[in-house]
Amino acid sequence: MPKFKDVYAVLPVSEHSAAVAWYERWIGRRPDTEPMEGVAEWLIAGNAGIQVAHSPEAAGKSAVVIVVEDIDDTVGSLGARGVECGAIQDYDFIKLTEVADPAGNKVTFVWENPNYRPSTADD
C-alpha cells in the first residue's frame, strides 16, 4: 500500500485573481505558495490543503469538505470577513454549513459531534 503524505483539494476557477482574493479573505492570509502561474495553494490543516487552479472549463464543478472544531465560530469568523455561509444544518452526528466560491465550487464546513452514538439494534 502506498504511504500518502499530503492531500490537496483542487478547486478549478475561471477568474483566478477573484478566487484567490476570496480564499485569502476566509483563510485569513495570502497563499502559502504559488507553484506555477494560475495556481495558488494554502496548507489549512496538518498535511491537507486547498489548491485554487485557473481552469475555466472545469470551474464551479468541484466540492471540498473541511472539518472544523467549532461550526458557530467558523460561521461567525467567515461572516466577519465578508464570507456569508448558508444556515447551519444539524443532523445530530454533524452540523454543517455551505458556501460557494466565486466560480461556484462548493465548500462545506462540518463539525462532528463527539458525543453522538448511533442507535443499535439493542436500543
Predicted features and spans:
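N-terminal beta-strand motif that seeds the catalytic metal site of vicinal oxygen chelate
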Residues: 1-20, 62-64, 113-123
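Core segments of cupin and vicinal oxygen chelate
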Residues: 3-6, 10-49
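Vicinal oxygen chelate
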Residues: 16, 64-106, 111-117
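A short linear hydrophobic-aromatic micro-motif
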Residues: 30, 50-52, 84-87
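Conserved catalytic-core motifs of GNAT/GCN5-like acyltransferases
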Residues: 30-36, 89, 114-116, 120
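Short acidic/glycine-enriched loop/turn segments that link adjacent beta-strands
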Residues: 36-39, 58-60, 91-95
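Short, charged/polar surface micro-motifs in flexible loops or helix N-caps
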Residues: 46-49, 57-60, 70-73
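Short, charged/polar, Gly/Pro-enriched secondary-structure boundary elements
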Residues: 47-51, 104-107
